[in-house]
Design a protein with these regions (language model features):
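Conserved hydrolase catalytic core segment
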Residues: 117-163
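Conserved HGGG/HGGXW glycine-rich cap/lid loop of the alpha/beta-hydrolase fold
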Residues: 42-93
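A catalytic-pocket lid/entrance helix-loop region that shapes and gates access to the active site
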Residues: 148-188
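Short, hydrophobic alpha-helix immediately C-terminal to the catalytic nucleophile
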Residues: 68, 108, 132-136
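Alpha/beta-hydrolase fold catalytic core
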Residues: 1-54, 76-79, 116-117, 152-153
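Alpha/beta-hydrolase
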Residues: 187-240
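Active-site loop/oxyanion-hole signature of alpha/beta-hydrolase fold enzymes
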Residues: 34-39, 76, 86-122, 126, ...
Length: 240
């Protein structure tokens, strides 16, 4: 992962609790903006600022607020839990480019604002895959790795023939450019909190409806015609 620069900004992302709440869920104790790689990323913390750090990456199409149940429990056990909204997610800025490498650079930029000491890496789904790659790229920055249903990177395997890697890259780039053209003027359809929760439930029917209605006001914005998820419509899993 290339070296990055980060600058913590003085104002802070919103951490007001939604209404109604959800049993066991708690909004972060602190929040801040991190200027990283040309983007403003929203970072959040639960727990004692002097406690040992768990660095937490959320899943694809999620945001740091989806840790509002897990992080408080870890914080109450003495940990300092730190997460952030990935580029194009939650309160972080949208970007002209999304890639696995860009996510790694952003993660390292946020980590650099926390501590130089090794910490625990924790990631869920795509975030688990991201933390796997981070552990390989910067092994001196972690003590332990917790992978919750993590996905592997979509980078080409090193033992593939060069012509196969080239063909894969051509196919991926073509599909990505076609996708960008299709969504150039796209806008996420508005809805009520219940409607957005129902859409998210289709991605994972096991999730409690009340929990989904709790996270909508955290990861979405209310407009005159209804609520819309803050996630950039141009996003695709794995960057490309």
């Amino acid at each position: 992962v290339p070296a990055t620069t980060a600058d913590v900004q003085p104002d802070a992302p919103d951490i007001a609790p939604p209404s109604p709440g959800y049993p066991g869920a708690r909004r972060p104790d602190r929040s801040r903006w991190v200027q990283a790689n040309g983007l403003r990323l929203a970072a959040y913390e639960w727990g004692d600022p002097d406690g040992p750090v768990i660095f937490m990456a959320h899943g694809g199409f999620d945001f740091a607020g989806t840790y509002d149940q897990l992080a408080p429990r870890l914080a109450d056990a003495g940990w300092r839990c730190v997460s952030w909204d990935a580029r194009g997610h939650g309160s972080s800025q949208h970007a002209p480019l999304y890639s696995w490498t860009a996510d790694e650079r952003d993660a390292l930029a946020v980590l650099d604002t926390i501590t130089d000491e090794p910490v625990v890496f924790l990631g869920h789904s795509k975030g688990g895959g991201l933390m796997l790659d981070m552990a390989h790229a910067v092994p001196h920055r972690l003590t332990h790795l917790v992978n919750l249903d993590g996905l592997p990177s979509r980078n080409a395997w090193p033992d593939l023939a060069e012509r196969e890697r080239t063909a894969m890259l051509h196919s991926e780039l073509t599909a990505w450019l076609d996708h960008r053209r299709r969504i150039a003027s796209a806008e996420r359809p508005p809805g009520t909190i219940a409607e957005l929760a129902a859409r998210r439930a289709r991605m994972n029917p096991r999730l409690d409806a009340a929990w989904l209605e709790y996270v909508v006001p955290i990861g979405a914005t209310e407009h005159p015609d209804g609520w819309r998820w803050n996630i950039d419509p141009s996003l695709r899993f794995g960057g490309f």
